[in-house]
Amino acid sequence: MFKKFDEKENVSNCIQLKTSVIKGIKNQLIDQFPVIEPWLNQIMPKKDPVKIVRCHEHIEILTVNGELLFFRQREGIFYPTLRLLHKYPFILPHQQVDKGAIKFVLSGANIMCPGLTSPGAKLYPAAVDTVVAIMAEGKQHALCVGVMKMSADDIEKVNKGIGIENIHYLNDGLWHMKTYK
């Protein structure tokens, strides 16, 4: 999604949101990530301006005080940015890939089933279309945000094909876009 993303070329405009819209977004975030509720006022303080940065390909990035927090495509579900995920690692369930998959994930490749079932990888129970944080063997922070394309049970049984779709990874265009004022 952000492989060829460039802040100067892809950002079209930035809009400050009304409080009623912010409430709706907060409720949507709580529905989507229930564990975030106690931390939401810390992540999105009431007095701070919340803005939506509109980009090409119908991508919207939610910012507070210039800090990029969440993004979505075509009014779909919200995904946390990796910067937010590094501050609050508990908001998404984790899956762990082995050391051999790290360089491929960091180049934007989807996570294949063998990278989740080999020694060094850890596959936790998760349903299809669950947003997950991809951790790496021996590393502390998440290296990508992805969406489960198969359930954890199916990944273990089939062990072929794409298991998790890579949505946002370290060093992609969104990662390089540190803040937006």
Curated annotation (Swiss-Prot):
GO terms for cellular component: cytoplasm. Plays a role as translation enhancer and involved in cell cycle regulation. Pfam families: Pre-PUA, PUA. Keywords: Cell cycle, Cytoplasm, Growth regulation, Transcription, Transcription regulation. It is found in: Cytoplasm. It comes from the Eukaryota. InterPro entries: MCT-1/Tma20, Pre-PUA, PUA, PUA-like_sf, Uncharacterised_CHP00451. Belongs to the MCTS1 family. Residues 92-171 form the PUA domain. The keyword Cytoplasm applies. The gene is MCTS1. The PUA RNA-binding domain is critical for cap binding, but not sufficient for translation enhancer function. This is Malignant T-cell-amplified sequence 1. The lineage of its organism: Eukaryota, Metazoa, Chordata, Craniata, Vertebrata. One of its GO terms (biological process) is formation of translation preinitiation complex. GO terms for molecular function: RNA binding.
